[in-house]
Amino acid sequence: MNRLNCLAAAGALCALFVQPVFAQTVKVTPLGGIDGEFCAQDRALVFEDPNGTRVLYDPGHTVAGGGDPRLGRIDVILLSHMHNDHLGEAHIKAAGAGTCAKPDISVATPQSNVVDIALAKKSKIVTGSEMPPFFAARLKAGGGDPANSMLARFGGSVTVGGVKIATVAALHSNGVDPLFIEGELGKEMKAAGLAGDVGPATGYVLRFSNGLVAYLSGDTGILADQQLVVRDYYHASLVVMNMGDGFTTGPAEAAYVVNELVKPASVIPSHANEIGTVDGKLRPGSKTEAFVKAVKMPAYVPLSGHTMEFDAAGKCAAGC
């Protein structure tokens, strides 16, 4: 074989091994109440890095505890804030239990769904503000390792399984339901209509091993940080954006955030608090439809159980 042929063969061999690295994608799988739909209580998403690391975000009510067969391995759980629809004071009996409008959330979780899943999967829990001690105590009480409750406060980050996790500001309340506070104090707080304080709510910015940067808004309003931090510093190209109104930004406000402040390549609506789809299609007149129509970039509705794949630039490569 002459020198040119050797070089050509070497180049082809390099291409064989290098090309898949650039083709790697992050998989995003919604874990909602009804397969193939986007429903009122749906919050949970699983992100799978190309290296296999799996991140569960805001499991809430629609993950059926640590034994939910949809979970698979979970390396880290992210919780944006302590409200029950994200933390999970109870969960569905199984995927498909109840209806899209009213899932059967009848299985109580005294230590929270987040903790039950973390114990079952031996997962890390990454939170910000003053939330980590809450989870450390409950992991210990359940026979787990309290060190698995990890802190990533504003401006800082931690890396788990090759995924870099940073917390960013969210404009939202963050009270702990008194049912998670034991003894007379919890009873008195409940009677007074008070919640525990664990500091500000958070969003997350994730940097995956393929280079994709994703912004998970949590529950929030409009913030200057969505441009100054999320866009200008982190350069997020995929956004998961709450748009349910009342408790968070509504469709118009959420569209403003992604259109004018973050400007990602793609967006996934979240926290609709409504029946967003019927038979897997946008429900006419819904807030979800209004948001999808208002954004300037592709919006991909998170249909439960349907995996989407995103490349390093935040563009959908499959499943959308």
Across the structure, where does each feature detected by a protein language model lie?
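Active-site metal-binding motif and surrounding structural segment of the metallo-beta-lactamase
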Residues: G52-L56, G60-T127, P133-F134, K140-M150, ...
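Binuclear metal-ion centers of metallo-dependent hydrolases, dominated by the metallo-beta-lactamase
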Residues: I117-V158, A255-C320
